[in-house]
């Protein structure tokens, strides 16, 4: 049994141990920031576009962060659904369509988790198509960042016209020049990240020696976000010099007209009944179809397997279901207690190279089993959809990122969730969205670009094997970019994969690889082709 009183008691004790220990608490706080590079860009971009309700998203995602940390006891993140977010930004989808797409995924995941259909999806959908959706979604974010956010800006300033035709002084705080500077910082951050990945294969003594000479790593998205907020505050204060009425909220998003002292989140002011009618919108269905394999394989199966790898039963027995480990002491084991930011185990998988589909058995019996994880994702989206919350899921990449930054318990995401919950509860008025409306598009574009490149890089690096697999991935990603429709890209990738299988069957090819991946070349050609592929170095590796 997973949801048992003794297990929950052990998890609470595990979380409290990390909360009350000063050096472990610092590691948990550091780990909670590890996944902000994905959350902040998409949260800001979707909020400013009017595709989500920002206060509801902060409140519900914070609440789900807290519940996830209490139930699972591991730093399992609550992330945006990236394929839906990318499609929404590229297609300028309204709030109802975006949220309805997340609700459809919630329905599907609930059905799959309740009927045991996750393994069937794992067999039916080839990995190359899933990676193609990742690459296509990532490149869609890059296109949205460059074409919709940075390109309209001026090189040194961006004119801001108000009702009286006067430009605001804040126009100097948003330009392409700022975007170039922010992009330079992003490239430096990527270089430091690559250096850390190279050190993961070195001896522990050499790695600790090099780490001691390096400055403390802070998520670049967090730095850019804080600087952008300061710029936004300055722009808001400067805009008072010339009378200017705030623009209407995009997509007719409701605002709270109550006095400032009553700006506490009220469900009556944030309910969106049109979400249910948008369930029949073909655009929402298309976005959900593209997101479903990504959620099933990466957010459920890969996250479950990765949790078992990062938190093995011999080091973290308190996180496992009641079996032979149920008689273990309530306090965390010494190896778990001594884990900190400076002593991360060298075998920790990186956020770019999780281990999807590596161990289904351990994934079902690990600290994050498949069925509870799928129920968690469906509950998050179905319960929050009427309030316009951003489509949410868990993720293996975010789990690895937070673990790398020092998170070893649910304390990290509980602290992050508490912060988001309080922001959504006490700052739901129009002032918060107005402040974000002054957030420099230069910084936002670079943040979204970084998130898109990171998402695409994961897809590119996880495609291994035959040339046909890469062709399927490119067909999927290219069709997504060409038609600006993730569903069309998914169907194109499946059609390409099916065509290769038919050609292999007609030509007497053999089936090779996990999950039905095909090896369509002969043995000699296959060895020669594989040797050539191994000599190539993927971009940003």
Swiss-Prot record:
The chain crosses the membrane at residues 24-44, 58-78, 98-118, 137-157, 168-188, 214-234, 287-307, 413-433, 435-455. GO terms for biological process: molybdate ion export from vacuole. One of its GO terms (molecular function) is molybdate ion transmembrane transporter activity. The keyword Transmembrane helix applies. Residues 193-213, 317-366, 510-541 are annotated as: Disordered. It holds the Pfam family MFS_MOT1. Keywords: Membrane, Molybdenum, Transmembrane, Transmembrane helix, Transport, Vacuole. It comes from the Eukaryota. It is a multi-pass membrane protein. GO terms for cellular component: vacuolar membrane. Belongs to the SLC26A/SulP transporter (TC 2.A.53) family. Exports stored molybdate from the vacuole into the cytosol, making it available for molybdate cofactor (Moco) biosynthesis. Plays a role in molybdate homeostasis as high cytosolic levels of molybdate are toxic to cells. Not required for molybdate import into cells. This is Molybdate transporter 1. It comes from Neurospora crassa (strain ATCC 24698 / 74-OR23-1A / CBS 708.71 / DSM 1257 / FGSC 987). The gene is mot-1.
